[in-house]
């Protein structure tokens, strides 16, 4: 039996998980997802880890492996570090065993990964554009529109005449949105337009790694945005790809899960 922790330090949040692994049967003990905001991500990771230990009734000495991913390589108490594409692929297959591709949609970039049935990476590609296709950009727009982040997806699905944001540059795209607001364009139509722009680029990213059929699991901070997921599948159909994108309630934890599993089987 192995007890292993996975810590994914991202740009916007720290995701921490704790597993007990016996054979090939993992038991999820505890999890936390903490927004970084203005805090030190490494101190936050340590607080989260200690909180999970307390929740699970464990001591630090009970944990066999502390695996990090994302920006966690400099975390003082980690045992080993794993690259994000490998952890997201492994975590995705745990969450959905049929997943043969992953879309990691994070605060600063998007990443498409093609993987096998074990969660081993076959190829991957990241967005090269600046942040108009990122979670941070969408968060900034939501703040400007005066809406909560968790309202973005549902508002997007209410659009009746979306206004597409064409600019790749985040600064220019934000200027486009300001102009839309001054023209009286509704929040649902603005958000749907942003989703259309993001989804088009993400679908092309999937195609570029050869993900042309099967299940795609969305991971990362934007994975639970149902408006983006709906628009992504619309874009996939338009590009005549035989894949379907899904999410999972625990999609944001995929990187931390994968790190924990790679640590357990070292």
Identify the function of each model-found stretch:
Residues 32-38, 55-87, 113, 122:
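Short beta-strand-loop/turn "lid" adjacent to the catalytic site in phosphate-handling enzymes
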Residues 210-235, 248-252:
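Glycine-rich phosphate-binding loops at beta-strand->alpha-helix junctions
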Residues 138-139, 246-266:
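Glycine-rich phosphate-binding/hydrolytic loop that grips phosphoryl groups
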Residues 173-207, 252:
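Adenine-nucleotide phosphate-binding core of ATP-dependent small-molecule kinases
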Residues 49-64, 202-214:
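Phosphate/pyrophosphate-binding loops at sites that engage ATP/ADP/AMP, CoA/4′-phosphopantetheine
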Residues 2-8, 63-67, 100-104:
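Short glycine-aspartate micro-motif
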Residues 4-43, 121-124, 128-129:
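Short glycine-rich, Thr/Ser-proximal phosphate-binding strand/loop in the N-terminal lobe
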Residues 37, 120-161, 261:
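Glycine-rich phosphate-binding loop plus the immediately following alpha-helix
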């Amino acid at each position: 039996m192995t007890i292993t922790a996975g810590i994914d330090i991202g740009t916007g949040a720290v995701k921490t998980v704790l597993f007990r692994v016996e054979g090939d049967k993992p038991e999820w003990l505890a999890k936390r997802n903490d927004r970084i905001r203005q805090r030190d991500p490494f101190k936050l990771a340590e607080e989260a880890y200690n909180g999970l230990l307390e929740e699970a009734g464990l001591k630090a000495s009970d944990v066999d492996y502390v695996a990090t991913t994302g920006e966690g390589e400099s975390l003082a108490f980690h045992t080993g570090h794993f690259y994000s594409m490998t952890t997201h692929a492994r975590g995705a297959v745990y969450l959905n065993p049929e997943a043969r591709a992953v879309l990691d949609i994070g605060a600063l970039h998007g990443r498409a990964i093609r993987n096998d049935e074990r969660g081993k990476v076959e190829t991957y590609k990241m967005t090269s554009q600046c942040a108009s296709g990122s979670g941070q950009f969408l968060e900034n727009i939501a703040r400007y529109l005066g809406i909560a982040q968790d309202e973005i997806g549902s508002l997007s699905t209410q659009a009746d005449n979306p206004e597409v944001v064409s600019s790749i540059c985040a600064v220019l795209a934000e200027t486009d949105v300001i102009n839309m607001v001054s023209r009286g364009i509704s929040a649902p139509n603005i958000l749907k337009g942003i989703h259309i722009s993001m989804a088009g680029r993400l679908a092309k990213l999937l195609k570029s790694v050869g993900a042309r059929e099967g299940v795609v699991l969305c991971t990362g901070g934007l994975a639970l945005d149902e408006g983006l997921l709906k628009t992504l599948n619309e874009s996939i159909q338009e590009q005549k790809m035989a894949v379907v994108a899904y999410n999972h309630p625990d999609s944001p934890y995929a990187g931390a899960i994968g790190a924990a599993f790679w640590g357990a089987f070292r």
